[in-house]
Amino acid sequence: MAQLYFYYSAMNAGKSTALLQSSYNYQERGMRTVVYTAEIDDRFGAGKVSSRIGLSSPAKLFNQNSSLFDEIRAEHEQQAIHCVLVDECQFLTRQQVYELSEVVDQLDIPVLCYGLRTDFRGELFIGSQYLLAWSDKLVELKTICFCGRKASMVLRLDQAGRPYNEGEQVVIGGNERYVSVCRKHYKEALEVGSLTAIQERHRHD
């Protein structure tokens, strides 16, 4: 039986690397995979999933208007698909998460989704909210804060490196705009208005 998986984490936990490895494992066994990523995120070039360690794969793009079930069913009818993998799945809509559950339930194709659980305000993304609700399997990919604790929160930094938690939910950036930290240091950095000051304080504790 196929299942819907949600692999979630903070930033820089190796989500894209894990996706590419999963896709490779299927392909190595002669199975066909289809990879999707969000059209909104083109940091590494449109139409591909890239990891920070240099791996990459071509990918189909989705936006809020994409009919994922229809697309996948049409492609599956032409040539069998053995697994669908979705990067940046936090950008999925409620309807698209439902459609991916239909890919699993109606077409019997496993769907592996990789993305962030929460945004820089500590709020759930819509896609993540429904994946948490409807997935068969939830898997946390762990990364660590500068203090060594598990990083579960994402800080957004302005151009001067100051953390803030207001503004639009989606601003695409890499390491220079976002950093993963534990909950304690997320709260402290916002309170003090400086991640650097918190890091310095931690070094001297």
Swiss-Prot record:
Location(s), subcellular: Cytoplasm
GO MF term set: ATP binding; thymidine kinase activity; zinc ion binding
Active site location: E88 (proton acceptor)
EC number: 2.7.1.21
Signal peptide region: none
Recorded catalytic activity of this chain's protein: thymidine + ATP = dTMP + ADP + H(+)
InterPro entries xrefs: P-loop_NTPase (IPR027417), Thymidine_kinase (IPR001267), Thymidine_kinase_CS (IPR020633)
Pfam families: TK
Cross-referenced Gene3D superfamilies: 3.30.60.20, P-loop containing nucleotide triphosphate hydrolases
Residues bound to Zn(2+): C145, C147, C182, H185
Binding sites annotated in the UniProt record for ATP: S9, A10, M11, N12, A13, G14, K15, S16, D87, E88, C89, Q90
A Gene Ontology term for the protein's cellular component: cytosol
Superkingdom per UniProt: Bacteria
Coiled-coil stretches: none
One of the GO biological process terms: thymidine metabolic process
Keywords attached to this entry: Allosteric enzyme, ATP-binding, Cytoplasm, DNA synthesis, Kinase, Metal-binding, Nucleotide-binding, Transferase, Zinc
Description of how activity is regulated: Allosteric enzyme which is feedback inhibited by dTTP and activated by a number of dNDP and dNTP.
Enzyme class: transferase
Assembly and interaction partners: Homotetramer.
UniProt family annotation: Belongs to the thymidine kinase family.
Function of the protein: Phosphorylates both thymidine and deoxyuridine.
Name recorded for this polypeptide: Thymidine kinase
